[in-house]
């Protein structure tokens, strides 16, 4: 029996996908999910693998699962844009590509892709892709310009109240700015809609630890550990889960065909309850 660090296992699966070894990649993803059913990095591999296989229905479901954890995930939004375009749903295709653009507004490939999508929908290609409010919000957030970010987010939520990613950045900015009660209230609202949203659970766990240092783990931390088993090893002094050594989480990499996942649709339905974002 060969054990491998979970992060190294992810890198191995990524290489299989890059080499178009789709079925073997599926088997290794199933091996991880049998032990860690909500391990979110494996779902990133699965989404790309199902898209490579041209299984649109399952790849769409998986990308929506990822967005329920990371509402502005770059790869999931690009993947969903591609899927909606292929289904002829151009408004949704543009919406998801804009979400990706907001993370990388200076990326010329994304700008060109948006121009192409607008031309396909409207028969007119814009000369320039304008900076969106979402892109501005995320630029302010990355620079820790709390007041500017919060002001823009409140305007953004007035215009688009369903933008969960805006609410999430608002909670993060409020927490960092010291408005912790308002940050916690915002996160409670988010997890009522997206129970496994990473950042919201992370902030709520920090708030719980501040109040109950001697008590057992919070439900929020347990959820985070379901999504990333390395989170079980987080200590108060640990800055980020990425600082946990790779070898902390090991998994057997020998495949057992009898324990594979034959019906991915049922597995996803049993493991997650997620609506399209």
Please state what every model-predicted region is.
Residues 108, 143, 211-214, 227-277:
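Intrinsically disordered, low-complexity acidic segments enriched in Asp/Glu and Pro
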Residues 4-41, 45-58, 131-158:
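Alpha-helical segment of the N-proximal tetratricopeptide repeat
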Residues 5-6, 40-41, 74-78, 108-109, ...:
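Helix-start (N-cap) detector for alpha-helical repeat units in TPR-like alpha-solenoids
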Residues 18, 52-53, 86, 103, ...:
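Register position in tetratricopeptide repeats
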Residues 35, 69-70, 86, 103, ...:
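Structural marker of alpha-solenoid helical repeat scaffolds
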């Amino acid at each position: 029996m060969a054990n491998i660090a979970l992060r190294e296992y992810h890198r191995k699966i990524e290489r299989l996908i890059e080499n178009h070894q789709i079925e073997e990649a599926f088997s290794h993803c199933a091996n991880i999910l049998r032990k860690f059913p909500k391990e979110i990095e494996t779902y990133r591999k699965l989404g790309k693998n199902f898209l490579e296989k041209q299984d649109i229905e399952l790849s769409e479901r998986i990308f929506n699962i990822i967005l329920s954890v990371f509402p502005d995930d770059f790869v999931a939004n690009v993947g969903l844009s591609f899927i909606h375009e292929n289904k002829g749903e151009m408004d949704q295709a543009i919406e998801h590509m804009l979400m990706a653009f907001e993370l990388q507004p200076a990326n010329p490939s994304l700008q060109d892709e948006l121009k192409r999508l607008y031309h396909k929908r409207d028969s007119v290609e814009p000369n320039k892709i304008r900076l969106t409010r979402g892109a501005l919000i995320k630029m302010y957030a990355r620079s820790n310009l709390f007041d500017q970010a919060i002001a823009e987010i409140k305007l953004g939520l007035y215009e688009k109240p369903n933008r969960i990613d805006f609410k999430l950045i608002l909670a993060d900015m409020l927490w960092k700015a010291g408005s912790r009660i308002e940050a916690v209230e915002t996160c409670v609202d988010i997890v009522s809609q997206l129970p496994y949203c990473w950042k919201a659970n992370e902030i709520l766990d920090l708030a719980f630890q501040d109040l109950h240092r001697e008590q057992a783990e919070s439900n929020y931390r347990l959820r985070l550990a379901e999504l990333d088993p390395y989170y079980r090893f987080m200590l108060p002094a640990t800055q980020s889960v990425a600082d946990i050594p790779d070898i902390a989480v090991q998994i057997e990499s020998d495949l057992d065909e009898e324990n594979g996942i034959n019906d991915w649709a049922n597995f996803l339905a049993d493991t997650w309850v997620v609506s399209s974002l």
